[in-house]
């Protein structure tokens, strides 16, 4: 340090300012070179594209298609940049969108309806028609709703979960009160899987991807699916009960961006449905699994690709909301259900 000081003191006073200015100029030039260098990540960032921020569960099923969308640059090809905020749980994802730290998130139909009734409407862009499954041991005699009477039933979530509500509605039509005629316990899906394996319950009402894991492991089967329950209630079995939600006012102001996002989603879903090799890259996001479990998850995801949201399906979504307890006089209007332009 003393040696450096002596050198500085030896410089003519009139040259000190020149050296200082020269150093600043060289620093700016060096920074500019870094920015345009082909090895710098920012140089590959498309300039001027609008950014769409979405919160998604790190190990959630929506992350599969959004990661593929980014990997294939379908966002950039459609004129925007997708920015994912990975979160650990559903409350964190909902908080991200309600607080405005992201533009959108994945939510189910009932959440979107509850926000509408609370005075904060969200635009609902269909994501998946997968609701869940009723899973039993392979050798079980349970094959219908009526067979559940007197049985021990594990239910994912709480009493207001869509699967349980639909199941009880169908049972009521058959003169069965499952809350009275069966032994019901509510728990998290992983705990229900373990309870089924330990023979602590006879059947579980669970989310589709937990059902897929069980069936992929072998020894378990679907007694009947949620699609069967929807049919029994005279509803279309292919209803998008999960969607990407965006604050309605913001979505109206950015209608073009929403349209680009929806178009890139359709492209991602089509690629994942049409080419199984795309899924190999996604395996780390799908958890440790055998080949059979992996295939069950892949096939289940593809099977949940929503059909076009026709007038009838939008009407059925509203009827589904009424069945699950929503106020029939305060339903989400059809304008909050996104529909791709022709």
Segments from the language model and where they lie:
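Short, solvent-exposed loop/beta-turn-alpha elements that line the ligand-binding surface or hinge
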Residues: 77, 228-237, 302-311
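Secondary-structure end/capping motifs
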Residues: 251-326
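Short, glycine-/small- and polar/acidic-enriched structural segments
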Residues: 44-177, 185-186, 202-208, 223
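N-terminal secretory signal peptides that target proteins for export/translocation
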Residues: 1-20
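Bacterial Sec-dependent signal peptides at the C-terminal "C-region" and cleavage site
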Residues: 35-46
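Conserved C-terminal helix/tail region of periplasmic/extracytoplasmic solute-binding proteins
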Residues: 318-342
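Pocket-lining segment of extracytoplasmic ligand-binding domains
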Residues: 109-110, 185, 190-281
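Bacterial N-terminal signal peptides
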Residues: 25-37
